[in-house]
C-alpha cells in the first residue's frame, strides 16, 4: 500500500484543490425567441444564431 513519505503542507493541498471548483454554464439569449440557452448550443425550439436549423416535432 502506498504511503506518503513526507507530510504535504496546507499550501500544497490548497494548490492541488484550486482546480476542483465547479463553474456554472454560461447562458445566452436567443435574438429570435428571447429564450435562454447554453452558448454554442441549439435552443429547445431549434434555433441557432437566429436561424431555424432543426425541425422540432412533438415527442410521442
Swiss-Prot record:
Residues 7-16 have a biased composition (Basic residues). Keywords: Ribonucleoprotein, Ribosomal protein. The keyword Nucleotidyltransferase does not apply. Signal peptide: none annotated. GO terms for cellular component: large ribosomal subunit. InterPro entries: Ribosomal_bL32 (IPR002677), Ribosomal_bL32_bact (IPR044957), Ribosomal_zn-bd (IPR011332). Disulfide bonds: none annotated. The keyword Ribosomal protein applies. Residues 1-47 are annotated as: Disordered. GO terms for molecular function: structural constituent of ribosome. GO terms for biological process: translation. HAMAP family: Ribosomal_bL32 (MF_00340). Belongs to the bacterial ribosomal protein bL32 family. This is Large ribosomal subunit protein bL32. It comes from Teredinibacter turnerae (strain ATCC 39867 / T7901). The lineage of its organism: Bacteria, Pseudomonadati, Pseudomonadota, Gammaproteobacteria, Cellvibrionales. The gene is rpmF.
